[in-house]
Amino acid sequence: MNKPVLVVMAAGMGSRYGGMKQIDPVGPNGQVIMDYSLYDARRAGFETVIFVIKHEIEDAFKAAIGDRVSKAMNVKYAFQQLEELPAGFAVPEGRVKPWGTCHAVLAAKPLIDGPFAVINADDYYGPEAFQVMYDYLSTHAGDDFYRYCMVSYLLKNTLSENGSVARGVCIKNEDGTLQSVTERTRIEPCGGGAHYTEDGGESWVDLPGDTPVSMNLWGFGKSFLDEAEQRFAGWLTENLPVNPLKCEYFLPLVVTELIEENKAKIQVLRSTDKWFGVTYREDKPLVVDAIAHKTAEGQYPEKLWE
């Protein structure tokens, strides 16, 4: 069994935040959020990282993080490109938005030869998540089912004080596997928990603070890439006529189909760490403070890669 590798999705445009937030410093020596994720991943056992980026940001990305991390990890690059579509499909006129998280992972397919974990570039996941993920991927191969996993967080540990967030709300089976994950695109804090709306704020549905949610930290086998690739053309046929400029091929979509078809079992691993991220510019000072606190406590050195 090959060692698990880490895939970092960094091609998104950071639309809500305005700017290339993946390389916006938050640490005491100019570190970005991704530095801390990669440092935690390396400590957990991951030795290879594949960055999925856009060609346009390649030089800036390497200067900001890739070259630095390459001192400690084997660094590879994959490029998510709009025109990378199945035969018979073309990019709709006016489309600039990337094709989503599943398309991002497919960009890395030629570089993946075993189990892999997927993370967002701009989320702080904490050390526990990478450890449980690495341990699972290192010890679980497929059998009668594809054996995948995800790390869930408590919803209350993933909210922003500065606006709504999108989260994958999870329901678990009795055996701890994932029954379903539903993307809620507008969740806001409310009392001790949260609530979400699907109709622009006309009505709200309460969610308890301890609801398990996905932060796009998934663990897959190589089989997932074949499944995602085979389903892409069908997804395009269905979605392009409806929403040509904004539709996105998301990881949970394929995960849900594989669960419904009884092909995959996705173990829900837990992290009690608090998530940090810069969804809005106003979030940044909170992240800077949190990192400073963790550094002062000795969880991270002042200089990560030296």
Question: Can you say where each PLM-predicted feature lies in the sequence?
Answer:
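Conserved core of the sugar-phosphate nucleotidyltransferase
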Residues: P127-L217
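A C-terminal functional module that forms or caps the active site or interfaces directly
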Residues: A228-A264
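Conserved nucleotide-sugar donor-binding
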Residues: L217-E229
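Generic C-terminus detector
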Residues: D283-E306
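Short, surface-exposed amphipathic charged segments that create phosphate/polyanion-binding patches used
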Residues: A87-P98, G163-G168, E282-L286
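Short beta-strand-to-loop acidic/aromatic patch adjacent to the donor-nucleotide binding site
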Residues: G114-Y124
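Short phosphate-binding loop-to-helix
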Residues: V69-G114
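N-terminal glycine-rich phosphate-binding loop and ensuing alpha1 helix
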Residues: N2-G66, V75, Q80, G114
